[in-house]
Amino acid sequence: MAVQKSKPTRSKRGMRRSHDSLKEITLSKDKFSGEMHIRHHITAKGYYRGKKVI
């Protein structure tokens, strides 16, 4: 089993955890339908950038 040589510092622990926080979802308004959707995702009606994809 691998064993560390020395205890990681508080700084290294913090740097490792820096990406663990939850981020707020960015919503965008579709230009064509006016519907709100998650950025870079299709709308609930199946449109992406004004084109029907589903």
Swiss-Prot record:
Start and end residues of each stretch annotated as Disordered: 1-24
GO molecular function: structural constituent of ribosome
Regions of compositional bias (Basic residues) in chain numbering: 7-16
GO CC, one annotated term: large ribosomal subunit
Pfam families: Ribosomal_L32p
Alphabetical list of InterPro entries matching this protein: Ribosomal_bL32, Ribosomal_bL32_bact, Ribosomal_zn-bd
Keywords, alphabetical: Ribonucleoprotein, Ribosomal protein
SUPFAM superfamilies, per the entry: Zn-binding ribosomal proteins
Domain of life: Bacteria
One Gene Ontology biological process: translation
Official protein name in the record: Large ribosomal subunit protein bL32
Name of the gene encoding the protein in the UniProt record: rpmF
